[in-house]
From Swiss-Prot:
Domain of life: Bacteria
One matching Pfam family: Ribosomal_S19
UniProt similarity note: Belongs to the universal ribosomal protein uS19 family.
Record gene name: rpsS
GO cellular component: cytoplasm; small ribosomal subunit
Protein name (database record): Small ribosomal subunit protein uS19
Described purpose of this protein according to its UniProt entry: Protein S19 forms a complex with S13 that binds strongly to the 16S ribosomal RNA.
SUPFAM superfamilies registered for this protein in UniProt: Ribosomal protein S19
Keywords: Ribonucleoprotein, Ribosomal protein, RNA-binding, rRNA-binding
UniProt keyword ATP-binding, yes or no: no
Amino acid sequence: MARSLKKGPFADPHLLKKIEAQVDSEKKSVIKTWSRRSTIFPSFIGFTIAVYDGRKHVPVYVQEDMVGHKLGEFVPTRTFKGHKNDDKKTGK
């Protein structure tokens, strides 16, 4: 289900504050965040945001085609290890 248009996109205020601080200081360092639910705004383009996947922070470089998506879409939380091998041996 999509978010209501009258509500607008969501981004955590602390994340917006960190982006604005880096724009003002003209320094680009990795921004750590736990906010996977934040929508990527056009002002995020060119920044590297380390998004938490439940175990570690994974760096995501924000590009133009990511605008409008959520940060969590680009960092999977589960690692697929493969299915169990069934060793069906005949003979005793």
